[in-house]
């Protein structure tokens, strides 16, 4: 399964990343997930903040810091999902921190 990640930026002394995976390929995925996360220095774990994926049969957005919120359905392709989190990562990092 192809995947990649890149640094989105820094917020409140945390470095945020966007990771993306697609199966079977980036240009025609049957399944995909694009995740915003940071690495927690103390716990040495990756903390997922937000994710766009199609794991429930439709493309949706999960704000992982608000587990009780329903999934937000979105009409995005894989590459649009990557662009969405790349452009808006700071909004979700801030919401996660507040």
What is the role of each PLM region?
Residues 9, 14-16, 23, 53, ...:
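Small/flexible residues
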Residues 62-98:
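Acidic, low-complexity intrinsically disordered segments
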Residues 28-68:
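A short, structured beta-strand/loop element
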Residues 1-42:
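Negatively charged, low-complexity tracts enriched in Asp/Glu with abundant Ser/Thr
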């Amino acid at each position: 399964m192809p995947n990649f990640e890149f640094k989105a930026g820094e917020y409140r002394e945390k470095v945020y990343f966007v990771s993306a995976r697609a199966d079977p390929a980036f240009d025609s995925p049957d399944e995909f997930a694009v995740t915003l996360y940071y690495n927690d220095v103390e716990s040495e774990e990756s903390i997922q903040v937000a994710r766009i994926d199609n794991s429930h049969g439709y493309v949706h957005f999960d704000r992982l810091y608000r587990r009780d919120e329903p999934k937000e359905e979105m009409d995005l392709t894989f590459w649009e999902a990557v662009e969405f989190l790349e452009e808006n990562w700071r909004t979700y990092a801030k919401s996660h921190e507040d």
